[in-house]
Amino acid sequence: MYSLARPLLFSLDAERAHALALRSIDTAYRTGTTSLLSTRPVPLPTPAFGLMFPNPVGLGAGLDKNGEHIDALLALGFGFVEIGTVTPRAQDGNPKPRMFRLPEYQAVINRMGFNNLGVDALVANVQRARRRGGLLGINIGKNKDTPNEEATSDYRYCMERVYPLADYITVNISSPNTAGLRELQEEQSLRRLISDLRETQEALGAQHGKRVPMLVKVAPDLNDRDIDAAARVLADLAVDGVIATNTTVTRPLIANHPLAAEAGGLSGAPLLGQSTLVLRRLRARLPESIPLIGVGGINSGADAVAKMAAGASLVQCYSGLVYRGPQLVGECVNAIRRRREAPSSGAVAPL
């Protein structure tokens, strides 16, 4: 079905196509025709962060920034959906055009800039959702006009608002599209921010009588020394999990493409190797008590298996859906199932 719709979507501006695709998924959900888009995979229960995921394949943050399509997206067969990034106050993001497809590379460049309706609007949408069939992650960030020295207050405010509703919360400090945000990954800044948020997490757990896991999403552009420093901080502060990785600002694999000079984060197939290297290094540096979600460049079931072999407990897709459609979800679940049943058949050589 998606193969028929893709030419129409690709004839449109990327951001308009994004909106049309979401409306179409919603329509299919409301009319009971989601099965025409994808077949829900047989469950593959997977534990992580003290939660049990129906299957290990999730939707990465960014597709549904405001939590307006949760039920329709879960119906596609995802084991979990991550919404956001959301900020305390609504903001428009960066000027358009700000999203570009690179079909030759099965890639996307975006510089959206945390465009969203604000955390209060997201909370209202989540409260209306039925949330059947999978778990919900909520990805939080800071407003672009909030200085880094005051970033903790933005993250804390969002955490307080979404804590009663989220199955897990992701702290996004790795988007390349908010000026200065990635500086929060520097060792001392990271330690201050995550220490404060861990205290907030524990206080909210006592207040609400439940512990919601807190994950941290990191960039693929960290060098080995920075990865090791981040791993030390995250292990010291006992975060619940790490998502590796966000998009990249580097362009080595698409250097000759006319759009390579566009500012923003590159995602899709060219990110697979780089993001998986970071994932593998983090797995080697972090205790097994801190599970990892592998994201970046998953365009096939084999790519999902490569993430698992590199140390991921769960995986997320986003740009791959642009090129493969919802069938990618079941393909990834089934590939991971085969690896789980016969681990040697799913092994991959070191990157």
From Swiss-Prot:
**UniProt membrane topology term:** Peripheral membrane protein
**Which cofactor is essential here?**
FMN
The similarity annotation says:
Belongs to the dihydroorotate dehydrogenase family. Type 2 subfamily.
The disulfide bonds in this chain are none
Q: Which reaction does it catalyse?
A: (S)-dihydroorotate + a quinone = orotate + a quinol
How is this protein named in the record? Dihydroorotate dehydrogenase (quinone)
Catalytic activity, EC: 1.3.5.2
- Cofactor binding note from Swiss-Prot or TrEMBL: Binds 1 FMN per subunit.
Encoding gene (name): pyrD
Instruction: Tell me how this protein assembles.
Output: Monomer.
**Catalytic site positions:** S175
Instruction: Give the NCBIfam families listed for this entry.
Output: PRK05286.1-1 (NF003644), PRK05286.1-2 (NF003645), PRK05286.1-4 (NF003646), PRK05286.2-5 (NF003652), pyrD_sub2 (TIGR01036)
Keywords for this protein? Cell membrane, Flavoprotein, FMN, Membrane, Oxidoreductase, Pyrimidine biosynthesis
The record ties this protein, via Gene3D superfamilies, to: Aldolase class I
List, alphabetically, the GO terms of the cellular component aspect.
cytoplasm; plasma membrane
Q: Which residues bind substrate?
A: K65, N110, R111, M112, G113, F114, N172, N177, N246, T247
Q: Which GO terms describe its molecular function?
A: dihydroorotate dehydrogenase (quinone) activity
Indicate where this protein resides in the cell: Cell membrane
A Pfam match? DHO_dh
